[in-house]
């Protein structure tokens, strides 16, 4: 036996919709089920602010950071090789179809890696904190910067927020999306605006506060959330 798998059984009245989906590695039946997923867990008494980035996946208001896995970047050579093999095959041939399928499988693997990573991290963060704050980023607007678009898509920001909000509901925790304006520029100690370029990685203020740029932003994000909802315990 390689491992175990938990099975959930639902009555036919709970199944609201069934869809047949084709992926690069086969067909899947997707069932939409109406079920209460909420679970009660003990309050942790902790609150945290998260600043997502490209260098680190996120830095929190405690100064801890999670490395960026860069699944797409790490698979770029393999993807280029797969694309090249597709272009070398004659259109309409069986070999070209096989090459296209292999390319699709590679993209599918990256997509699943991203989703699982975002889900794992979000679940861990939510279960460890009673309130989680993050920036209300508009990803579509940010990726208009073509120099950063590939890195931003590879950074899982959208998936991570989606799972934070899902697990927030499931475990009865508070999730707050705050206005991202000035979170990196404002001093988390005195509130002074300290302008800096993207290449400036250290926040240095005249008040004497010197912090990693992302750490400073994460503290500001948490402060903004707490000013909105108060010091909340669930």
Residue spans of the language-model regions?
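Beta-strand/loop nucleic-acid-binding surfaces
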Residues: 2-6
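Positively charged, helix-rich recognition surfaces that bind polyanionic ligands
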Residues: 8-14, 22-234
